Curated annotation (Swiss-Prot):
Keyword flag tRNA processing: no
Organism of origin: Homo sapiens
Official protein name in the record: C-terminal-binding protein 1
Highest taxon above the source species: Eukaryota
Reported effect, residue 138 to A: Strongly reduces E1A binding
Active site: residue positions: 266, 295, 315 (proton donor)
Transmembrane segments: none
Amino acid sequence: MGSSHLLNKGLPLGVRPPIMNGPLHPRPLVALLDGRDCTVEMPILKDVATVAFCDAQSTQEIHEKVLNEAVGALMYHTITLTREDLEKFKALRIIVRIGSGFDNIDIKSAGDLGIAVCNVPAASVEETADSTLCHILNLYRRATWLHQALREGTRVQSVEQIREVASGAARIRGETLGIIGLGRVGQAVALRAKAFGFNVLFYDPYLSDGVERALGLQRVSTLQDLLFHSDCVTLHCGLNEHNHHLINDFTVKQMRQGAFLVNTARGGLVDEKALAQALKEGRIRGAALDVHESEPFSFSQGPLKDAPNLICTPHAAWYSEQASIEMREEAAREIRRAITGRIPDSLKNCVNKDHLTAATHWASMDPAVVHPELNGAAYRYPPGVVGVAPTGIPAAVEGIVPSAMSLSHGLPPVAHPPHAPSPGQTVKPEADRDHASDQL
C-alpha cells in the first residue's frame, strides 16, 4: 500500500490504514524477521494472526512478501532497521524487539511512518547481571587465564609457579565498583557486587534522588568522578547519540591506573581502538566484553585482535532458556495486544509513542494480501520462493508445504487451529528502565 492508496482512503501521509481481523477477513501477517523458531509465539498468536519467519541475516534478505504484507514484525538484535529499510514495508504497523535494547531500530522514523516500536524491558535482568558478575570475578581472580595455562600444558606446582601463572589476581573485598546506568540490570549488579564485598558507586543522571539510600549505594554527580574513584567500571546504559564511545581515549585517561572495564550493554559505548591501546599500555589492567562495535565478533580482525588481558563473549550475557522463552512470550503478547486493541493505547511497552502520528485501530485490508494458511511458514530468499523449514514449525502446521515452491504455483490449503482464548494477561548514559534498559 503506497502513499497514493492512503490518500485515496482519505488518510494523511504517515498514518497507515487500520487492518481488520475478524471471521470474514484473513488474519494479519506477523513475521519473525531474524529467526526461524516461532514455536513459542505460535500458541499466543495462532488464533489472531498468520505467523511466518524470514530467518534473515540482513535486511536485504527480508522477503518481498513480508515487505508488502506484514503488519507486525518480531525481531532480535542481529539486524538493523534504518529509515530506508522501514520505508520498504508497505503495511507494517508494529515492531516488537525480542529483548530490551532497541538501538538497532530508527524509532523516530518508525513513528513518522506510523509504525509502533515496542520492547521487552524486563527481559533477562538476572542473566545479564549474573554474566556481568561472572566477568568481573573472572578479571579479579583470573580463572580464564589459569584455565588457559593448564590447557597449554603449563606446569603449575611450586608456589613460584602459582605466583607466576596467577599474577594479577586480586582480592575483591574493599574494591570499588563503578556502575554507569542504574536501571534494572545496574541495580541487580549492584546488589550482587555488595554481597562480594565491593563498595559500589553509580552514575545515572536520569535517575531520581533516593534510590542510593534505599540500596545502600554511593551516587556521584559526574562521569569523571565515577571513573576516577572506581577500581572496576561496568556499563549498564542504553546506546544513543549522546553516549556513543562513552569510553574513549579521553575518558580512559580519567580512569584509575590499572582499572578493569566490563561491558555487557552495547558495543558502541566503547571505542575499541582506545581500549586496545589502553590494554597494551597497561592503563587498563583487563577488560571483559560481551558486546562489540562490530558483531558477530571475531578475534582475527579488528582493533582488539592483539589486545592482552581481554575476555570476549558473543553477545550472550542475556541468554538462558528461561529468559529466552519469557521474552518471546511477552513479545508475542505485545503483538496480540496490537492486533486485538488499539495502537498505541493498548501497547504495554511502546518506546516511540511520542513519535507516532496517530493512534488507530487495526482494520480492513484487501483479502488477497494475507495468506492465513501460511501459519508457521518461512519467507526466505531467493525472492519468489516460499518454503517451510524442516524444523521449528508447530505441529499444527508441520508438513503443510513439503518443499520450497514458487509463489506463482499457489498455496496448499490447511485447516486452521481452533480459535483459542487470549493467553493470560551531556555525556548521559540512558539507563535500563522502561524506555531503555540494559541491552540484549
